[in-house]
Structure formats: structure tokens, C-alpha cells
Regions:
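Short, highly charged C-terminal tails/helix-capping segments
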Residues: 158-162, 167-170, 182-198
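Short intrinsically disordered coil segments
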Residues: 81-86, 134-138, 199-204
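Signal for well-folded cores of large energy- and translation-related assemblies
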Residues: 109, 141-152, 161-166, 170-178
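Intrinsically disordered, compositionally biased charged tails
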Residues: 1-15, 195-212
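Short acidic, glycine/tyrosine-flanked loop/strand segments centered on an H-E-D-like triad
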Residues: 109-153, 201
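General structural signal for secondary-structure boundaries
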Residues: 86-91, 129, 152, 190-193, ...
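Hydrophobic-cavity lipid-handling domains and compact docking modules
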Residues: 2-128
């Protein structure tokens, strides 16, 4: 055995496997196992999976989920949702000739102070004019921005990922023009409140010191 091969094998022997779990608002399901030589290095790692892997619902295969490792205890890594998105193939499948695609992007703040960027998309049955597009975007904004502030981050994730926002927008916007699909096609977590994620050099959130 060459020295280089032995060195690589020794590096792998020094690594431990960490089980990565979805957050409670996605059932705390195990979504991955990752090797790492130091639990501190697990913090900040991002794991990609699909909503199908969480729900076992075949219709959810087109939704990608990204989980961010926030805390490690033993060999268990707990996460928060960093974001989600439609697969490129699914998004392409929604396009139809003679229809209009309407996009809007909103930065929203949850009740517990997470800031998320939500990218909303609507596909109409027929081509619409500029005024109709404006009205549909206004409905998107009203529902997303008003409701986001009343929800904790976990609830907000459910609304975005499971299509609940899309259903609410659809039911109002269809009065402007017939629609084929509405949904939050992508989300991205921008700001995480203090005390949620382990600080650099630590593996878990430390309890606050009690003042004398």
C-alpha cells in the first residue's frame, strides 16, 4: 500500500458519521448521514433532499429542500430549512404556449424574526394584459406579506412548501383571470435570529448566562 493511499484511509478512519435530521416542522425525519472529522465542521453544512423523502408522497418529488445544520449533539445534527425550490424540469412542465407567467419576489419576516425571500409564480390559462398582471401581483403581495408576519418560521415553511400560500393566492387571483398553477417556486432564508444556530467554534446553542 502506498503512503498516499494509507494517508487517505487514515483520514477516513478519523471521521465519524453524523445523522442529519429535518426540523420538527418537517417531522424530525432523518434525511442524511455525513462523515466529518470534527462536529464543529458539521455546523453550516447544507443537505439537499426532496419533499417526497419527507412525506413519501410521489407528487412531491419535484420539490427540492435544503436543510442547514444548526446544532450538533453527539452524532445527531439538527437543522433548519435554508430554502426550497421547484425542480427545473417541473418548472418547465408548467409552461404553456398562449399563457402568461407572472413572477414576484418578496422579502418577508416571520413572527419569530426569520427573514426569508419568497419567489412566487403564477401561470395563467390564457394570455393576460399588463393590468391583470399587476392585479395578480398585488394579490400575491397582500397574502404573502400580511400572513408571513403572523406565522412562526416553521409554519411559514409549511405554507410555502406545501402549497398553502399558492392555494390562497389562486382562490383570489382566479377572479382576475383563470389560472393553471400558483405557488412559491423558491424560498431562501436570509436572516436567522440569534440563539438558533451554534456560533463559530461551537456545536450547539449555549444557554444564556443568568445575570446576578
Amino acid at each position: 500500500m502506498s503512503k498516499a493511499t494509507k494517508k487517505v484511509r487514515d483520514k477516513w478512519r478519523a471521521k465519524e458519521w453524523y445523522d442529519v435530521y429535518a426540523p420538527a416542522y418537517f417531522g424530525e425525519k432523518k434525511v442524511a448521514s455525513i462523515p466529518c472529522s470534527d462536529p464543529v465542521k458539521v455546523i453550516g453544512r447544507v443537505v439537499e433532499t426532496t419533499l417526497y423523502d419527507i412525506t413519501n408522497d410521489f407528487s412531491h418529488q419535484s420539490q427540492k429542500l435544503y436543510f442547514l445544520a444548526a446544532n450538533v449533539k453527539g452524532t445527531r445534527a439538527d437543522t433548519i430549512l435554508k430554502g426550497h425550490e421547484y425542480s427545473a424540469d417541473y418548472l418547465r412542465s408548467l409552461v404553456r404556449r398562449g399563457s402568461t407567467r407572472i413572477d414576484a419576489i418578496f422579502n418577508v419576516t416571520s413572527k419569530d424574526q426569520y427573514v426569508t425571500r419568497a419567489s412566487v409564480v403564477a401561470f395563467t390559462r390564457d394570455r393576460v394584459n399588463a393590468n391583470q398582471e399587476h392585479l395578480i401581483r398585488s394579490i400575491m403581495r397582500k397574502i404573502i406579506e400580511e400572513k408571513a408576519g403572523t406565522l412562526a418560521y416553521g409554519q411559514l415553511c409549511h405554507e410555502m412548501v406545501l402549497g398553502l400560500f399558492g392555494s390562497e393566492i389562486y382562490n383570489l387571483a382566479k377572479k382576475v383571470s383563470p389560472l393553471r398553477h400558483v405557488g412559491v417556486r423558491k424560498s431562501k432564508l436570509l436572516i436567522i435570529p440569534e440563539g438558533v444556530m451554534a456560533k463559530p467554534g461551537e456545536t450547539s446553542v449555549q444557554p444564556k448566562a443568568v445575570e446576578a
